[in-house]
Amino acid sequence: KEPGALGDPLYLDVATTLREAGLDTIVLTGGRYGLGSKDTPPSSLFAVYKELEKDAPKARFTIGIVDDVTNLSLPEVKPAPITAAEGTVECKFWGLGGDGTVGANKNSTKIIGDHTDKYIQAYFQYDSKKTGGVTISHLRFGDKPIRSPYYINQADFVACHNPSYVTKGFKMVQDVKPGGVFMINCQWSDEELAHHLNAEAKKYIADNNIQLYTINAIDKAIELVWVNVLIQFFSLHSSNLLT
């Protein structure tokens, strides 16, 4: 959109075409997505159709962000619709840049792709720091082709490789599907874990029957191998890919 323009180029082209064709009665709306490199999940796309069902939908809107300045953003549809192919397993891994989480998940994609008949898809998120920053790995695998060009928001398995994310209140367990698995790599006892988990996370775990596991890969890695290798084994085992 050019500064001072009434709309985006495509919106203006369509509006001009409709007007010249005498079709002014057609309701025309225009929206933006991908602003700030933000992901566009299915819940945002469903929000567009929900908006179009109104008698007077917004002429201009944005999706994928929360616009509290111009208030043009559409609220995402909740709960998020499930659009993945039936039988697809979705996993999400929260790591620390440089801890090997991304490398381990790339290895997992190779193992699953080379040694099973399953389809596999992987996306990786980094922040600007890269090393020492937050990384999120998104893995999908299943028996049917995977056509999900967006990040995972409702996972069967979520792993937190850095316990500081729990103490900082990162919303990780909220990405687990009801009945799914949430795993934390930490050195805490049960009492310490109960102290570090905030009330919102505890309520979500209880209300959605989340299976909570802890693994002390930190101490084990000192004795045996890297943290990422141990957690990679755990994630593959919990997904029933290891026999």
Where are the regions a protein language model picked out?
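Peripheral docking tails and interdomain loops at the edges
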Residues: 2-83, 214-224, 229-243
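Active-site cofactor/cluster-binding pocket
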Residues: 1-8, 12, 16, 21, ...
